[in-house]
Amino acid sequence: EVEQRAVDAVLATEEALGWDPEDMNRIQRNHPGYDIRSTRRGTHGQLGDVRHIEVKGRIAGAPTVTVSRNEILTAMNEPDRFVLALADTVRYLRHPFEGRSEDFVFEVTSVNFTWSALWDRAEEPA
């Protein structure tokens, strides 16, 4: 499945970056808001940074990607913790919906975005 391959790629990327990622779908199927919770310990072993990663994979050549209302709300409510991970090769887009709140009215259940527009704004994972 495309999505699981994408999640697996991001899990591996997070581990390579020194984070401790957890696949939320293994805890709760269709976890609302994000796919991966990734943590990093502080210098004294205490819980340090936390990030919530929503992973989007795609079938090769697909022009759009769909983001759910819950995913958008999570990104807007936790802008410094939220990362949208795009997986052809893995790229991270931080603050993906910043300045777009007027586009997401209450009745919206999901939004389609042009993959290339998101991809062009994304960066190498760090």
PLM features per residue range, with description:
Residues E1, M24-R29, R41-H44, I72-A75:
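Short, contiguous acidic/charged loop-to-helix segments that flank catalytic cores in large enzymes
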Residues V55-I72:
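Short beta-strand-loop-alpha-helix junction that forms the active-site gateway
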Residues E1, V7-W19, G48:
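ASCE P-loop NTPase motor core, strongest for the SF2 helicase catalytic module
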Residues G42-D49, Y92:
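Short, solvent-exposed loop/turn segments that connect beta-strands within catalytic domains
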Residues E14, D35-S38, D49-I59:
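Conserved catalytic cores of phosphodiester-cleaving nucleases, focusing on short active-site segments
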Residues E78-A126:
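Domain-level recognition of nuclease-like catalytic cores that cleave nucleotide substrates
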Residues V2-L11, R29, G57, P79, ...:
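Nuclease catalytic cores
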